Amino acid sequence: MSILNLVRADLLNSQNYVPGGESARYRSHANELPWSPVTMGEYNLNYYPNIGLQIELQKQLAKRYQINSDQIILTRGSDDGIDLTTRLFLTAGKDAFMQFPPTFPMYAFYVRLQQAELIECPLDRRTNFRLTLDQIENSWKPNCKVIMFCSPNNPTGNLVDLNLIAKTCELYTNQSIIVVDEAYIEFANAPSATSLIGEFENLIVLRTLSKAFGLAGLRLGCIIAQSPIIQAFNKIIAPYSIATPSMELAKRALNNSDWFTKTIEQIKSSRAWVIKKFADNPIIEKIYPTETNFILIQTRFSKQLATWLARYGIAVRDFPSSSLLHDHLRITVGHDEQNQLLIDALSSFNADVAGLNYEKDFIY
């Protein structure tokens, strides 16, 4: 059985849109204006993005991720990759998508847009959200076309074991596409699932430049998979989907490897410092292990604390009262000044609850 049999049948034989005219001197085929009010280096912004620039950036990223250049395609951030995946594989009213909550809410959003079934396989906070193969097998159904791992997971911060990903790929060969969203993997002390791409044809890895690369404003990411799957994605990606300025700025930024190395180490160091300060705070009842640039904490004062921090201009992520994480906050590690303000604001909040003692369940 071909892995392409998992692609929606109505899309499998569709034709790619090929704009053409890339090398022509006079572009009389695309109805563009001959002038532009602004310029950007050698690129004419009055013209649609050049496919050559996209290929160059894909090759640059392929080298960084240690994959072949035919195993990658650009997206407008990870969200676009999630959207495209649900469109390519899920037939409305027929197919299902498995996720492991608490996790990134946009998975469920795009599944609903596609009118597919959502299979929930909840993680248990008592085990620090650890996932096992038994849990997956107990939740899987024959119509499950996509299994979505978020590693490290947002908002819990923990990794999915690479061996578990490999076993899942093997177990559901020709039955399910296994997707690994690695938006935060650069902050982790662990190998990427891209190392498994050559081994499993049903594996897709999503990467982004929005987090560790500090380029969220460019809206750039990529889908990584074996070549046949990438070719299938090409059938549903709109032409000219990535803007010329985004690609050009990303190319320049990716040349600055020293900056990325230094920045990631700085975040890791700051993360350790913030965790230590949290551990000394009596209102924080639990600190979860994290392999990301954020920290998940448990506190019975979550709603009050979020409101308190907002007075200092600090926005943190809290969760609905109906959520498993209703008494938790997700807090991003920032620069030194931002981190110090956070700790100072927490200390001032403590003054309002001084004298109260709570048992803590610290991981660190």
Swiss-Prot record:
Q: Which pathway or pathways does this protein act in? A: Amino-acid biosynthesis; L-histidine biosynthesis; L-histidine from 5-phospho-alpha-D-ribose 1-diphosphate: step 7/9
> Which InterPro entries would you find in this protein's record?
Aminotrans_II_pyridoxalP_BS, Aminotransferase_I/II_large, HisP_aminotrans, PyrdxlP-dep_Trfase, PyrdxlP-dep_Trfase_major, PyrdxlP-dep_Trfase_small
Please give the cofactor(s) recorded in the UniProt entry for this protein: pyridoxal 5'-phosphate
Residue numbers bearing the N6-(pyridoxal phosphate)lysine modification: 211
Q: Which SUPFAM superfamilies match?
A: PLP-dependent transferases (SSF53383)
Keywords of the record, alphabetical order, are: Amino-acid biosynthesis, Aminotransferase, Histidine biosynthesis, Pyridoxal phosphate, Transferase
Any one GO MF annotation of this record: pyridoxal phosphate binding
Q: What EC class is this?
A: transferase
CDD domains found in the cross-reference section: AAT_like (cd00609)
Give the EC number(s) listed in the UniProt record.
2.6.1.9
User: Which reaction is catalysed here?
Assistant: L-histidinol phosphate + 2-oxoglutarate = 3-(imidazol-4-yl)-2-oxopropyl phosphate + L-glutamate
In terms of Gene3D superfamilies, this protein maps to: Aspartate Aminotransferase, domain 1, Type I PLP-dependent aspartate aminotransferase-like (Major domain)
Q: Which HAMAP family match?
A: HisC_aminotrans_2 (MF_01023)
Assembly behavior: Homodimer.
Give the record's family classification: Belongs to the class-II pyridoxal-phosphate-dependent aminotransferase family. Histidinol-phosphate aminotransferase subfamily.
Q: What is this protein called?
A: Histidinol-phosphate aminotransferase 1
Give the gene that encodes this protein.
Answer: hisC1
